[in-house]
């Protein structure tokens, strides 16, 4: 008996645990077992966004013909995207219940890190973002659910006319302006039959994508660039998938359609599409897999009863996850191929870019080779342009797929950068040589003035800058040659110029000291000047110095001759200092009475 009780207790605990985990997982926001209105839609979207921040986000992608918001909801964090829409047709709003329930259940599974029907939801949604537009046709849905109540009175008669005079709108498929939104897309649009004027169903509009709702969907799909699309409809438990694909695309889409059929139990439609539908457009224009899934047995011209929903959910619960899984595979394959293609293109160009090395290293054998040729500059410009082009291409790749092309482009950039470093150093060196030459000309001409001093200062700065640039050059041999050609002559001339400028400034100081009659200082500076040996580099300058020093010496002699010489005073003889004789103190006064005071 005790063993039986123990076993029973274990079963109770196990069942309780199972029920708890299921209850936790099953905590829902969306109630799909109700007439799902635009108000319910918005309230649930807001709750989902608040409950799952960073995972669920809403976006208004446009307005309906009567100004209602058309909402898109993203679920996931991946770069890969897939697209699922519902309620193109007003009476098929059960597909809004379905898509909103997907968002709710998938988000809960992600949050609890739970699998759903064998799918790792967190992994899938980290790789792929599923974009839903749960209700493409909010005007039509509102009209079908509530009649004319929420539409302007001035339009009632027109809407009733589109419904063949009936005020019962349960059969309504179109938007509230009488345009069938799933007959608005471009493939074979002009071949579609049906009404020639606005109607509750099948009127394809005055032109392709004339309806606001269709424009919003087209613009949004262009923006998110999904890998795969599911368009949900409600009648027939069938899957449309053949949209004139051929070759590998046909084989690929047939595989996907087969899996969708296996998951849902729905039949694949073998007949050709009539055209004008969203999936026709996505497959034909975007050249990507698209499937129209009809979720319920045919119920006639009305909405699907809510009693059918439980089965619809059981058949479709995994569809969004399967779509996300396969969408990511397509995304990954496409971007891997694109990444490798770009990397290959860059590597091919690198054979051309490598020729830059001849200009900045290989062909530099002597100082005479230190120059920037037009061919060098042309190849550098071409390589820079190629790098910018490839950078733009790489930037379009998701971050995960940029490493290979970036690695190849790094080599291209090294050739470009080394070429630029070389050109920059040569340009700086040539400018330094020009300044050095100019300074030499001034000194040789015997010019020492503000212009000469400015050239000297410029030489000092350019020498430092050029030396820094040379140290960055690719080859040590090229650095050595550039130093010998540019830096050594500049530093030598600077050294000699330093000496000449110092002599010149000393001469100017002596002239000023003469004017101020500071003769002792002049004499000392003359001695100092004569100890400064001539470099004999600039004859005119040296001649000028000799003239100046002679003039100073002559002036000093003349001035010294005019100064009167004072006779020297003999020093006084050494003797003891005179000591003054003491002065006798007066006798104290004696009073008349003969007593001392």
List where the protein language model places each region.
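Extracytoplasmic/secreted proteins, especially bacterial periplasmic and envelope-associated proteins
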Residues: 36, 40-47, 94-105, 131, ...
């Amino acid at each position: 008996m005790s063993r039986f009780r123990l076993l029973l207790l274990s079963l109770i605990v196990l069942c309780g645990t199972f029920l708890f985990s299921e209850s936790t997982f099953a905590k829902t926001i969306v109630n799909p077992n109700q007439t799902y209105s635009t108000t319910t839609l918005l309230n649930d979207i807001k709750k989902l966004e608040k409950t799952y921040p960073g995972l669920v986000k809403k976006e208004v992608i446009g307005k309906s013909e009567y100004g209602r918001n058309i909402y898109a909801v993203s679920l996931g964090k991946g770069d890969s995207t897939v697209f699922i829409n519902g309620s193109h047709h007003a009476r098929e709003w059960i597909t809004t219940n379905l898509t909103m329930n997907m968002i709710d259940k998938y988000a809960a599974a992600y949050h609890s890190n739970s699998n759903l029907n064998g799918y790792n939801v967190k992994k899938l949604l980290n790789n792929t973002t599923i974009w839903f537009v749960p209700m493409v046709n909010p005007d039509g849905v509102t009209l079908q659910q509530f009649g004319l109540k929420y539409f302007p009175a001035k339009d009632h008669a027109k809407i009733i006319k589109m419904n063949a005079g009936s005020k019962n709108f349960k059969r309504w498929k179109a938007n509230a302006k009488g345009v069938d939104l799933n007959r608005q897309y471009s493939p074979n649009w002009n071949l579609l039959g049906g009404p020639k004027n606005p109607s509750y169903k099948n009127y394809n509009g005055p032109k392709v994508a004339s309806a606001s709702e269709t424009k919003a969907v087209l613009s949004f799909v262009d923006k998110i660039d999904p890998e795969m699309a599911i368009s949900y409809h409600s009648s027939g438990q069938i899957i449309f998938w053949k949209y004139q694909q051929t070759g590998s695309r046909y084989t690929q889409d047939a595989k996907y359609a087969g899996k969708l059929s296996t998951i849902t139990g729905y039949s694949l439609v073998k007949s050709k599409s009539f055209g004008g539908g969203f999936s026709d457009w996505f497959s034909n224009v975007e050249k990507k897999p698209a499937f129209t899934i009809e979720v319920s047995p045919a119920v006639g011209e009305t909405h699907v009863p809510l009693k059918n929903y439980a089965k619809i959910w059981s058949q479709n619960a995994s569809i969004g996850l399967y779509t996300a899984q396969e969408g990511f595979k397509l995304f990954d394959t496409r971007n891997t191929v694109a990444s490798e293609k770009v990397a290959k293109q860059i590597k091919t160009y690198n054979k051309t870019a490598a020729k830059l090395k001849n200009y900045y290293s290989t062909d530099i054998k002597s100082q005479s080779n230190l120059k920037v040729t037009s061919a060098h500059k042309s190849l550098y410009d071409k390589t820079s342009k190629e790098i910018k082009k490839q950078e733009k291409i790489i930037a379009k790749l998701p971050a995960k797929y940029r490493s290979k092309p970036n690695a190849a482009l790094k080599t291209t950039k090294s050739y470009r950068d080394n070429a630029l470093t070389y050109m920059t150093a040569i340009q700086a060196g040539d400018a330094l040589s020009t300044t050095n030459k100019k300074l030499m000309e001034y000194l040789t001409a015997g010019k020492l003035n503000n212009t000469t001093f400015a050239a000297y200062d410029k030489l000092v700065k350019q020498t430092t800058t050029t030396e820094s640039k040379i140290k960055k050059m690719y080859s040590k041999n090229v650095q050595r040659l550039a130093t010998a050609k540019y830096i050594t002559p500049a530093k030598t001339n600077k050294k000699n110029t330093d000496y000449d400028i110092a002599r010149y400034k000393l001469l100017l100081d002596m002239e000023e000291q003469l004017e101020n009659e500071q003769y002792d200082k002049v004499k000392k500076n003359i001695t100092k000047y004569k100890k400064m040996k001539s470099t004999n580099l600039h004859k005119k300058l040296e001649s000028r110095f000799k003239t100046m020093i002679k003039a100073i010496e002559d002036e000093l002699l003349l001035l010294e001759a005019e100064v009167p010489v004072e006779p020297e005073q003999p020093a006084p003889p050494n003797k003891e200092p005179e000591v003054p004789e003491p002065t006798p103190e007066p006798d104290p006064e004696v009073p008349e009475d003969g007593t001392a005071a």
